A protein has these predicted regions:
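Short catalytic micro-motifs in class I SAM-dependent methyltransferases
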Residues: 74-75
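Class I SAM-dependent methyltransferase SAM/SAH-binding core
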Residues: 3, 8-59
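A short glycine-rich, Lys/Arg-flanked "PGG" loop and its adjoining helix->strand segment in the class I
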Residues: 83-95
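Short N-terminal helix/helix-N-cap motif within the alpha/beta-hydrolase-1
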Residues: 80-84, 109
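A conserved beta-strand element that flanks and buttresses the S-adenosyl-L-methionine
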Residues: 71
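C-terminal alpha-helical "lid/dimerization" subdomain adjacent to the S-adenosyl-L-methionine
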Residues: 100-155
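C-terminal lobe and adjacent flexible extensions of AdoMet/dcAdoMet transferase-like proteins
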Residues: 156-161
Length: 161
């Protein structure tokens, strides 16, 4: 059972299904318009295993230890309180479960083009050390082999057992 936070139009859920073949995927987004688009794509992409829900990644509407895996395709940096987003991911993830993430850092989204295209909070931002520390503080162990640059991080963190 998997969760994608900030699912947008559903592309991430399609990747999750094709790559990991989970029995079910819950996909959550705060933007109803994006969820409506994801609903249309769900039919076109034959994603019967997908359940769409309106919700906030800073306050996930799920029970503790509900998911085997949580996926984040560049959503945490959109959260005003990104720390609560990480805490919530850890809370809903089962022990031994994986948090699969891709995140970008301020040097990338502070670019004028990014600022024009997408809204990003400007206060309480993170870079690599803060993001990695927050994972550890919430019982999420970053696996070796993660990729990081000045602009982004890509990796998997496993919840401690």
């Amino acid at each position: 059972h998997c969760l994608e936070i900030g699912c947008g139009c559903g592309v991430g859920a399609r990747i999750i299904r094709e790559t990991f073949k989970p029995a079910s995927i819950d996909a959550l987004d705060i933007d109803l318009a994006m969820l409506l688009l994801a609903r249309r794509k769900r039919r076109a992409w034959d994603l019967d295993c997908l359940r769409l829900l309106t919700g906030d990644a800073q306050k996930l509407p799920y029970r503790t230890e509900s998911f085997d895996a949580v996926f984040n395709y560049g959503i945490v940096h959109h959260l005003e309180d990104w720390q609560s987003g990480i805490r919530e991911v850890s809370r809903v993830l089962k022990k031994g479960g994986g948090f699969y993430f891709e995140e970008i850092y301020p040097p990338l989204y502070a670019n004028p083009l990014f600022r024009y295209l997408l809204v990003h909070p400007t206060e309480n931002r993170f870079h690599g050390p803060e993001f990695r520390d927050r994972l550890a503080q919430n019982g999420l162990h970053l696996l070796p082999g993660y990729k990081e640059s000045r602009f982004r991080i890509l990796g998997i963190a496993v919840k401690n057992t």
